[in-house]
């Protein structure tokens, strides 16, 4: 007979199953709905695996001593349910909970924890003697194939194996089993933390097929989505994508995930309509989120249909998919009926598949397709979210713009800047006119009021200034510079990086952009003590050029401001960010560079177009 305790739990979950449930339930097991079983060292890691699994909504983790059979310890059972709920039963040692797919908080794939006296089993393919577990984890992070490791400490029973570091991998990226073993420490690679020193190759190579081992294949609308899938696949190191124009129809939109023993492609074959590239899992500072935000016009995604709803516009269709815990992708058909345009609704088809990708992609049927944005909120270190000097600006509050820093020289505010990595600040080159050495510079993070800064305020010293070698004046372009800090900063709610723009989102339409800084609020005003903010619209380069006929507005610049004036950056805001929110993630779209006056009518502010310098930024931050 079902206990009252179980019935109450069932009613509770029935009311919140489509919402965020963060609580875990000890000595409770979900019954049925099994998708697969993996092994994880903790319930927290089990939830992480569930969250990033394409279909997992619930999980049950079998803790140590949960069974008389030790081979069942540390089992992580991934589950799904059409109703998003499952019945629960009492089970000693079981820990159950929900995926974080529907939760607003950030959940990183990064796991820095190490597990004492646990041996995570896998394919042992490399062994070496190292000083400690930290060095072993670093070796794993800097090895292309390594997913996790086990280190034998100085207390390991076998003297011959002490200080031994074993690098491991499996097909799934999780251990095949986990056992208790005294004197060892196990943990995971920190590649997903953005801490690998391996080469990061961001180029996508057209007309190229990589002829190496295919470990998996999925259907994708373009090479950028294919690359993101490869990046978050446990064993993919590089890929080949066949475009819509590929001659063999059955292979169009096919994304081939690949690996090799050496970690690099062995053979490149030139073929039209194929594109190839590399996983970005190795990229230091900025492993991309598993998120596909774009819309694909005249494109139908095929898959298992979950629901059909009438909505107004593809954005609403995408939001409906995102709010449905099981929806992975969608196709929206606009209405062509003769009716009031303002009330016209189209049909939104919510869909899913076993691997989270369409089973097939078709064109020419009038659909607009895209993906759920539910994983766009996952934390890749820089996916900072906030709630919403600036001439016409308003005062900011602590934690609202955590990437904004103030650069000081001679105990006074010089310029603004943006945190893009734990040792890197991006700012404007013109800020350093006449400054020969970085030794006098101070960088303050987490500051809202300049009056807060005194001799006891913590700051970062600058190790190196890197100014673009083509910079001459702000008006001529290339107004961009990097500061490398002497020591790495710790990220907090008040001091975090902002994401760089993605090449894959180069056609993104930014409708929510803000400028921030401590500059003058009028041309002859006073420097502001409190960080100012103002929302500004972007202005096309063509229109901006008509406002500045004496200057050349290039594609390496971007303009923003109101036609009537009133809100703009001003002297003292230089180097600060033009931050734009796109699909819930803030991106550094511009760097405050130059303009005429402050908030003058028909004189928009001119900013360095960061998207045009991403390759330069990555080159400098990864080689210095």
From Swiss-Prot:
It holds the Pfam family PAN_1. Residues 390-622 form the Peptidase S1 domain. GO terms for molecular function: heparin binding; serine-type aminopeptidase activity; serine-type endopeptidase activity. It comes from the Eukaryota. GO terms for cellular component: extracellular space. Glycans are attached at residues 90, 126, 297, 449, 490. Heparin binds at residues 547-550. Transmembrane segments: none annotated. It catalyses: Selective cleavage of Arg-|-Ala and Arg-|-Val bonds in factor IX to form factor IXa. Residues 1-18 form the signal peptide. Keywords: Blood coagulation, Disulfide bond, Glycoprotein, Hemostasis, Heparin-binding, Hydrolase, Protease, Repeat, Secreted, Serine protease, Signal, Zymogen. One of its GO terms (biological process) is positive regulation of fibrinolysis. The active site is at 430 (charge relay system), 479 (charge relay system), 574 (charge relay system). Activated by factor XIIa (or XII), which cleaves each polypeptide after Arg-389 into the light chain, which contains the active site, and the heavy chain, which associates with high molecular weight (HMW) kininogen. Activated by F12 (activated); the presence of negatively charged surfaces accelerates activation. Activated by F2 (thrombin); the presence of negatively charged surfaces, such as polyphosphate and dextran sulfate, strongly accelerates activation. Disulfide bonds join 20-103, 46-76, 50-56, 110-193, 136-165, 140-146, 200-283, 226-255, 230-236, 291-376, 317-348, 321-327, 382-499, 415-431, 513-580, 544-559, 570-598. Its EC number is 3.4.21.27. It is found in: Secreted. InterPro entries: Apple (IPR000177), Pan_app (IPR003609), Peptidase_S1_PA (IPR009003), Peptidase_S1_PA_chymotrypsin (IPR043504), Peptidase_S1A (IPR001314), Trypsin_dom (IPR001254), TRYPSIN_HIS (IPR018114), TRYPSIN_SER (IPR033116). The keyword Metal-binding does not apply. SMART domains: APPLE, Tryp_SPc. PANTHER family: ACROSIN-RELATED, HYALIN. Belongs to the peptidase S1 family. Plasma kallikrein subfamily. Factor XI triggers the middle phase of the intrinsic pathway of blood coagulation by activating factor IX. Homodimer; disulfide-linked. After activation the heavy and light chains are also linked by a disulfide bond. Interacts (activated) with F9 (inactive and activated) in calcium-dependent manner. Forms a heterodimer with SERPINA5. This is Coagulation factor XI.
